[in-house]
Amino acid sequence: MGGLDSEQKQLIKKLVNFHMKEGKRTKVRAIVYQTFHRLARTEGDVIKLMIDAVENIKPICKVEKVRVAGTIYDVPGIVARDRQQTLAIRWILEAAFKRRISYRISLEKCLFDEILDAYRKRGISRKKRENLHGLASANRSFAHFRWW
């Protein structure tokens, strides 16, 4: 991570930290770097590709449940910038884990496929984003219940 700026370092650090289970940072870092090596062989600039993939998955709006007069409404709202990146990375990792369970292949390959799909604006994580935006759009008539 020598020639990277702070935003790029933060993105890689978040990817490793969200991926980590039971404190096994070295193992996770090896998986992430193997994935990046695979991306470098196919696409070229890995960091730009990863940043673009996260940008394509970032949700702009969210839906929160609010109780008004005994009825629960799905109220749309705007997602903070830090939260957008966090959700995008989390959704990419979730999608990679889902692929691993359904296809029984290595996690590096699944993460590689999901990052490429996110870069090309398709895949499981992109579908999750589209579903969230559709739900927010469908419930925009309840936006006047938003008081936060």
UniProtKB/Swiss-Prot annotation:
It is found in: Mitochondrion. Keywords: Mitochondrion, Ribonucleoprotein, Ribosomal protein, RNA-binding, rRNA-binding. The keyword rRNA-binding applies. PROSITE patterns: RIBOSOMAL_S7. GO terms for cellular component: mitochondrial small ribosomal subunit. The keyword Ribonucleoprotein applies. InterPro entries: Ribosomal_uS7 (IPR000235), Ribosomal_uS7_bac/org-type (IPR005717), Ribosomal_uS7_dom (IPR023798), Ribosomal_uS7_dom_sf (IPR036823), RPS7_plant (IPR034643). One of its GO terms (molecular function) is structural constituent of ribosome. One of its GO terms (biological process) is translation. CDD domains: uS7_plant. Part of the small ribosomal subunit. Belongs to the universal ribosomal protein uS7 family. One of the primary rRNA binding proteins, it binds directly to 18S rRNA where it nucleates assembly of the head domain of the small subunit. A second rps7 gene encoded in the mitochondria is identical to the plastid-encoded gene. It is not known if the plastid-derived gene is transcribed. This is Small ribosomal subunit protein uS7m. The gene is RPS7.
